Amino acid sequence: MLPEWKLFIKEVEGKKENLQGADLGNKKLMGANLAGADLTDADLSISYLIKADLSKANLTNADLTGAIMSEANLKGANLGGAELDDAFLHGTDLTDVINLTCDQLELANFDNETKFPEYIQIDWSSDKTFTCCEREG
């Protein structure tokens, strides 16, 4: 028998095309396959999204405050207007993410293992200090 949180993941994965405005705050979604999910305006605050597949997901205006997304795959996701305050992006793949800004990143936590889209330049001055620059496309 699967633990309750794994059953919940299966339920969420089955509805991934229709999760606009969903309340997924403070949920265990580790390793969830949410590739291509429509999470517009969803509440994912303080959720555990470690190693989750959010590639090409629409996270427009999603609340990811305090979400733990370490080693998650967000390749090609839309992060326009998403709240990333205190989100953990350590080792997260943000390659080809669209609508990500330095303003969002300055409120998040990440490390030198985090992969950024080509239009975001991160220059580290120490282990915890960086400057972020958005390049013109």
Which residues are covered by each model-predicted region?
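Tandem repeat scaffolds
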Residues: M1-G137
